[in-house]
Amino acid sequence: MGTVPAGSRRAPGCGEGMFILCLALLLAPGAPAQYSVDDFGGLGRMFDGIGAISGGGATSRLLVNYPEPQRTEILDYLFKPNFGASLHIFKVEIGGDAQTTDGTEPSHMHYPDDQNYFRGYEWWLMKEAKKRNPAIKLIGLPWAFPGWIGYGKNWPYDFPDVTAYYVVSWIIGAKQYHNLDIDYIGIWNERAYDIKYIKVLRHTLDRLGLTNVGIIAADGDWGIAHDVLIDPYLNEAVQVIGAHYPGTHAAQDAIQTGKTLWASEDYSTYNDEVGGGCWARILNQNYVNGNMTSTISWNMVASYYEQLPFGLEGLMTAKEPWSGNYVVSTPIWITAHTTQFTQPGWYYLRTVGHLDKGGSYVALTDRLGNLTVIIETMSHNNSICIRPPLPEYNVSAQNATFYLQGSFQNLQELQVWYSNLDINNTKPVTFKKLTPVKVQNGSFTLQLGVNEVYTVTTLLTGQKGSFPDPPKSKPFPLKYKDDFSVRNPPFSEAPYFADQSGVFEYFTNTSDPGDHVFTFRQVLTQRPITWASDANQAISVIGNYQWSNITVTCDIYIETVETGGVFVAARVDQGGSPTDRAKGIFFWVFADGTYKVTGDLIGEIVLCKGLAGVRARSWHTLTLHVDGTNASGLLNGSPLWKEVVTGGPLHGWAAIGTSSFEFTQFDNFMIEAKDPE
């Protein structure tokens, strides 16, 4: 008996004499379309796994400050096999000291003679991922670079050996200090690639014995594929061609290379049922339409202040460490439909494709007799991703019969997992185990509604993991203080502060044996090679974006003589990539003895100014009080200015920062806010 091509409407066993009868039966109302699941004619491409990204930037910033057991629970939902998302791949930002969407992530080398492999939280996250799944693949990708790499230019490629040394040092540090083996490394996220640099990077990796580290290029569009086709040395250097938000289609040049193709960043959509529908559709159709064998979500967990760009666009949400509340969102369970029933190294079958009345199906095997089929019927309006635009199409309810052939023809029963994401449902169904389906005469039939996901599999290992409900959501505390007195901090950043320009770190002030031994310090002294339009000022935000009436107090220590400057702020209305456009109330003092009150971060909207008598290298206390339309400021407990009309945003975060990239210390930070409700 011949095989039935995917989407064929001819049933097995229809000989020439019975063709008219068979055709009539197939075209009868409600007759199921028929699809083959067959490995007899060979297999498709090898499956590389489903993954997610931390970074690009600071998307996991608040996660590290969660209390236990909630922090462990969140990590289990993300990484634990056969429990939640069960991710196969984990991609992190190689911090470059610059704003990369929702904040800055610190570099392991702020300066040429500086190496510190404990900054930030990506090392910790990679270890937590490996702890739960030792087989998870790890990827590092720079979004930005410390300024010294560019030798004064906003460009990382003029000295490719220097950039390669910097990136490879991160890989070596991961192994030396954390016993982490990095599997893949990228070039420069969504920015220009440089062919010479890619070759130098490959040579450097090989020379240092890192031949197993693959290069992914170029984390933008498919443009590098043309260069790979015409340059045999580049072709040899690149292991994976990765594109972002490909709309489920790969360029012909990319397919022609014969290389592994990935959607190396995708999704980036609000994590409700529509976001889940987006994720379900592209997880299947990135392979069906584009031969992409891995899809990686930006971002993994929305663990940053919601009012920053792309709020709630993670697979799940964990944005309230002060309350312990988190939300296991729909995309977690859509991920599980694939990840819990496949592994990297499985193979797609050639018999994959689109369903007759809309939707798609893929089938994968471990070549040891196991089979997993994932089916999605996402409608257009229930699966719109943030980008690119989605052309209109129709999906309707349908019956589908799947014929198991080749090595699967003797299967008798398959496990079934089901989700219904229809936005009109008051209670969507996610990842529900149904009664196993019996295979009769080598086939099984499903009644497929619209906006449904089915996983049909030989594997018995699926689980919808759960924990007791987390604590209820509550806003940031109205009173909060931090004296930064942590002798051995587990992380380099103080809780809840979200750096938006510059890098703020715990600091031990050995020159001050008194009250300011342990402080919080802005440590960048040079503008980084940026990914966004970074501010020239450093700023870290904290608190509740809805705060309006507030008092912010902080001890400050300017280290730069004559030109140094520092601020405390309230009602800061912008973070992320547009931080340089932030408005609010900013109270500045400078090492030249002056002060200034501005309505913006860049200092163009001057509300008042005068003499303060502040000098560098001594501690002072700044207090900013904002109430209604008026603001006032105190220096060392005495009024310096008062009743300045604000005229700017009505609410926003509290913040601290510096007038340039310069060393400055902060201590005894305190907030007292009135309930915005």
UniProtKB/Swiss-Prot annotation:
One of its GO terms (molecular function) is galactosylceramidase activity. Belongs to the glycosyl hydrolase 59 family. Hydrolyzes the galactose ester bonds of glycolipids such as galactosylceramide and galactosylsphingosine. This is Galactocerebrosidase. Keywords: Disulfide bond, Glycoprotein, Glycosidase, Hydrolase, Lipid degradation, Lipid metabolism, Lysosome, Signal, Sphingolipid metabolism. Disulfide bonds join C278-C385. One of its GO terms (cellular component) is membrane. The active site is at E190 (proton donor/acceptor), E265 (nucleophile). It is found in: Lysosome. The keyword Lipid metabolism applies. Substrate binds at T101, W143, N189, R387. SUPFAM superfamilies: (Trans)glycosidases. Its main location: other. It comes from Xenopus laevis (African clawed frog). It catalyses: a beta-D-galactosyl-(1<->1')-N-acylsphing-4-enine + H2O = an N-acylsphing-4-enine + D-galactose; beta-D-galactosyl-(1<->1)-sphing-4-enine + H2O = sphing-4-enine + D-galactose; a D-galactosylceramide + H2O = an N-acyl-sphingoid base + D-galactose. Residues 1-33 form the signal peptide. Its EC number is 3.2.1.46.
